[in-house]
Amino acid sequence: MKINKKTIGGFLLIVFGISVFFGGGSFGFIIPLAIGSLMTYAGIKRFAAGKTITGIIVGGIGAIMLICSLPFVVGIALAAAMVYYGWKLMKNGSADNGVSSFDPEPASAAYQSHFDDEWEEFLKKK
């Protein structure tokens, strides 16, 4: 499978779909998550550029917004893990087409009956 924009977009749609399923259909936590992520990124960039006070303030506010969105992030992580391991199981399952996962033991000699042989002999006599 080639990874391109469509496959990444499809995966993100699956993850958000499962997340919405777990969250009851609300996209309300996406906005603070995005704003918090952007503010944290901007704070780190400002801190690296030498503007320590504004970098700490902006990054701190962004981190607080991300921490408040922690249940949403955990839900997305759980949904992503489920999708990933489910896909991995599906791909491994399709690779083993010829291998049977259930191999019953042969019937023991004590349990076998000779009914079929006796029935055929009975039919021949008729």
Swiss-Prot record:
Subcellular localization, as worded in the UniProt entry: Cell membrane
Major subcellular location class: membrane
Domain of life: Bacteria
Keywords associated with the record: Cell membrane, Membrane, Transmembrane, Transmembrane helix
Positions of transmembrane segments: 11-31, 56-76
Residues of the signal peptide: none
Keyword Cell division appears in the UniProt entry: no
Topology versus the membrane: Multi-pass membrane protein
Keyword Transmembrane: yes
Induction remark: Induced, via the two-component regulatory system LiaS/LiaR, by antibiotics (vancomycin, bacitracin, nisin and ramoplanin), cationic antimicrobial peptides (human LL-37 and porcine PG-1), Triton X-100 and severe secretion stress.
GO cellular component assignments: plasma membrane
Protein name according to UniProt: Protein LiaI
Native species: Bacillus subtilis (strain 168)
Highest classification ranks of the organism: Bacteria, Bacillati, Bacillota, Bacilli, Bacillales
